[in-house]
Amino acid sequence: MINKIYGKIVDKKESSIIILAFPFEFEILVSSFCKMELRLLEDVEILTYFHFRDDDVKLFGFLNISEREVFENLIGVDGIGPKAALKILSGIKYDAFRLAIAKEDINLISKVKGIGNKIAGKIFLKLRGKLVKGDESSSYMLKFKELEQSIVNMGFDRKLVVVAFREIMLSDKFLILKEAEQEQFLFTETLKRLSV
């Protein structure tokens, strides 16, 4: 199995990236969120999943272990192969997916293009409890703990800030943002909600 590839991104295609790991070039299928985080000619470390069948050999790439873990759990669901799993992770970011499973939010999963209520229900039944480590929503929000404290220091009630964070983080607008843009969006939207 190929666990990880270090190299330079030399091309970005619709659903893949090309990495030069001298002397080889690898085409790696990635989610749209993963692709948005990567820049051409950037040196990267991509975690991989090597898919091998008699008639199909593909390499799938991920920014971190959590994204790969969600992918591997998804392909364990009957009827969901690697391409479908990647399509799901292109429609909903891996950490939001984990949060949706933890919060039993089947509607968020079923909003992904090509995933209806039936498949979303199947995913939920198979993965319920598998992706949750403690309070998933709390671990998801740890990234924004300093931002939360900053807003509380402005005189807002912590409970209201946390509620606003959770609602905003599950919104479509938040989920399509690059990680670097999420904090600013969360700050602005939280202040809008709390200032009403």
UniProtKB/Swiss-Prot annotation:
Ranges for region Domain I: 1-63
First and last residue of the signal peptide: none
Flexible linker, as annotated region: 143
Pfam families linked: HHH_5, RuvA_N
GO process terms (BP): DNA recombination; DNA repair
Intracellular or extracellular location(s): Cytoplasm
Record key words, sorted: Cytoplasm, DNA damage, DNA recombination, DNA repair, DNA-binding
Major localization class: cytoplasm
GO molecular function: ATP binding; four-way junction DNA binding; four-way junction helicase activity
Matches recorded under Gene3D superfamilies: 5' to 3' exonuclease, C-terminal subdomain (1.10.150.20), Nucleic acid-binding proteins (2.40.50.140)
Any Gene Ontology CC annotation: Holliday junction resolvase complex
Annotated stretches, region: Domain II: 64-142
Residue segments, region Domain III: 143-196
Domain notes: Has three domains with a flexible linker between the domains II and III and assumes an 'L' shape. Domain III is highly mobile and contacts RuvB.
Similarity comment: family membership: Belongs to the RuvA family.
UniProt subunit comment: Homotetramer. Forms an RuvA(8)-RuvB(12)-Holliday junction (HJ) complex. HJ DNA is sandwiched between 2 RuvA tetramers; dsDNA enters through RuvA and exits via RuvB. An RuvB hexamer assembles on each DNA strand where it exits the tetramer. Each RuvB hexamer is contacted by two RuvA subunits (via domain III) on 2 adjacent RuvB subunits; this complex drives branch migration. In the full resolvosome a probable DNA-RuvA(4)-RuvB(12)-RuvC(2) complex forms which resolves the HJ.
Biological role: The RuvA-RuvB-RuvC complex processes Holliday junction (HJ) DNA during genetic recombination and DNA repair, while the RuvA-RuvB complex plays an important role in the rescue of blocked DNA replication forks via replication fork reversal (RFR). RuvA specifically binds to HJ cruciform DNA, conferring on it an open structure. The RuvB hexamer acts as an ATP-dependent pump, pulling dsDNA into and through the RuvAB complex. HJ branch migration allows RuvC to scan DNA until it finds its consensus sequence, where it cleaves and resolves the cruciform DNA.
The protein, known as: Holliday junction branch migration complex subunit RuvA
Organism field: Borrelia recurrentis (strain A1)
